[in-house]
Amino acid sequence: MAKQITSICSFIFGASDKKSLPDESAPEIAFAGRSNVGKSSLINLLINSKKAARVSSKPGCTRQINFYSMYNDKFRIVDLPGYGYSCASKEEAVQYLNLIEYYLIHRRNLKRVFVLIDSKVGLKEIDKDFVYWLICNNINFNIVLTKIDKVNQESLNAILENTQKWVNNEHVSIHQISIRVKHKITKVRDEFFKFTR
C-alpha cells in the first residue's frame, strides 16, 4: 500500500486568502501546530514520501494553506501555516491567523484536525490556546506528539500524562511519533486513514 500512496498524492495549490480556497467536494484532514513542529515531515511519513509535502526553508515562513489531493481527489491533506513564529509582519501574521480560523470554522468537508506538539518542549501556552479554541468551536481533533526520539522515556511519559490531563477528553486520541519508530507511524497512519472513509 505504501508504494501506491506516493504515486497518487499531488499538490493542488496554496490558498493565501478565503477566495482561493478550493471547493468542498472532497473530505479534508488538516495538520496544525507551532512552526517547525514537523507538520510537513509527518505528512510525508504518512503517505510514504520524502517530498510530497512542501517544507519551508525557514520556520514560520509558510504563508498559505497547502492542499494535497489523494487518490484523484477522493480526499485531501491540508497543511496549515505554523503558529507561534513567523517571518511575516504582525499585520500579515494576523491575516494568516484569520485565514486559518476561517478555514477551520467554515469548512464543511473538514473531517479532523491533527494538532502536532513537539515532545521536546511539551504543551506551550500557544498550543493550549489553539486547542482550547478548537474545543470552543466544536472542531474535532487529535494530538500527535512529535520527535519522541529526542526525549527520554521518563520525560515523554510526563509530557503524555500532562497532555492527557490538560485535554481531559476521552474522544481526543493522543499519538506519539518518530521517524525511527515504525510501529508508531503505522498507528498514526491507521488513525489518519480512518477519517478518509
Curated annotation (Swiss-Prot):
Mg(2+) binds at S40, T62. GTP binds at residues 33-40, 60-64, 79-82, 146-149, 177-179. Its cofactor is Mg(2+). Residues 25-197 form the EngB-type G domain. GO terms for molecular function: GTP binding; metal ion binding. Transmembrane segments: none annotated. GO terms for biological process: division septum assembly. Signal peptide: none annotated. Keywords: Cell cycle, Cell division, GTP-binding, Magnesium, Metal-binding, Nucleotide-binding, Septation. The keyword Cell inner membrane does not apply. Disulfide bonds: none annotated. NCBIfam families: GTPase_YsxC (TIGR03598). Necessary for normal cell division and for the maintenance of normal septation. Belongs to the TRAFAC class TrmE-Era-EngA-EngB-Septin-like GTPase superfamily. EngB GTPase family. This is Probable GTP-binding protein EngB. The lineage of its organism: Bacteria, Pseudomonadati, Pseudomonadota, Alphaproteobacteria, Rickettsiales.
